[in-house]
């Protein structure tokens, strides 16, 4: 498909979902899809282990596998009527019989793309075309990333209004040219290195996932540390910033 939120839209339409439980610790990328399809949304908390803090649900449970910290064994133990969002765990295998979605743009330099594993079907005839959205990807090979940041943001915003489409032929072709084993190995090594450096200070008890998305670092004085670095060209990832308002609710 063309994007992760439309993978959810696909499931809503094909399974006729009318009620869904979503984590509070999440960006608003799916809000429009849920509103447009008239889905009742119940929000739930997660713990510091990123597991849902609820004992039952009477609709579908949307599980976000934050930072790849949820094992397939745990996911299977949750039972039926669940949807797994592996947008942050691209290299984790889907579980037979459980609807699972992946997004490609979080891991690879492609302008669109999502993968959905499901046993439900609806006809999707329109194929996305992404050739006109390659500028910010190609430009970074010869210029600085900051020069193309606006194009990157505009591309992300575009999908908020895009209907369900199939993945573009261009993205499909690019994905077939990736050395996935190399990417998985390098990402795993990077996560392990960071965890070795920060394990004692990190308030999170982490597992090292294969092909990690990013390293989540939760420090007791994290807000002060951020202030100290705000005038330095230091990398603060957007995901950490947009979720920060929920951190205190996780305790």
Task: Give the positions of each predicted feature.
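Active-site regions of enzymes building and remodeling cell-envelope glycoconjugates
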Residues: 37-42, 58-61, 77-83, 96-103, ...
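Active-site C-terminal subdomain of aminotransferase-like
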Residues: 121-170
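Conserved PLP cofactor-binding pocket of PLP-dependent enzymes
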Residues: 207-218, 222-251
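Short beta-strand-to-loop capping motifs
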Residues: 32, 118, 217-221
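Conserved glycine-rich beta-strand-loop-beta hairpin in the small C-terminal domain of fold type I
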Residues: 166-195, 204-218
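PLP-dependent aminotransferase-like
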Residues: 2, 6-81, 86-90
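Active-site PLP attachment segment
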Residues: 97-139
């Amino acid at each position: 498909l063309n994007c992760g939120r439309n993978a959810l839209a696909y499931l809503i339409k094909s399974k006729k979902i009318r009620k869904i439980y979503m984590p509070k610790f999440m960006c608003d990328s799916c809000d429009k899809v849920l509103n447009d399809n008239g889905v009742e949304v119940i929000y739930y908390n997660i713990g510091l282990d990123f597991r849902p803090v609820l004992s039952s649900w009477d609709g579908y449970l949307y599980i976000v596998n934050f930072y790849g910290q949820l094992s397939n064994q745990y996911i299977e133990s949750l039972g039926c009527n669940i949807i797994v969002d592996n947008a942050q765990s691209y290299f984790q295998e889907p579980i037979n019989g459980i609807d699972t979605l992946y997004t490609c743009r979080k891991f690879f330099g492609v302008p669109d793309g999502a993968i959905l594993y499901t046993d439900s079907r609806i006809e999707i005839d329109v194929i996305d075309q992404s050739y006109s959205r390659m500028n910010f990807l190609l430009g970074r090979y010869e210029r600085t990333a900051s020069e193309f940041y606006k194009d990157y943001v505009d591309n992300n915003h575009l999908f908020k209004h895009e209907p369900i489409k199939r993945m573009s032929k261009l993205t499909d072709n690019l994905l077939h040219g990736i050395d996935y084993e190399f990417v998985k190995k390098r990402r795993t090594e990077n996560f392990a290195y960071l965890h070795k450096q920060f394990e004692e200070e990190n308030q999170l008890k982490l597992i090292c996932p294969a092909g990690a998305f990013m390293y989540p670092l939760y420090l007791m004085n994290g807000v002060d540390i951020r202030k100290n670095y705000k005038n330095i060209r230091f990398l603060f990832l957007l995901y950490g910033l947009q979720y920060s308002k929920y951190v205190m609710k996780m305790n």
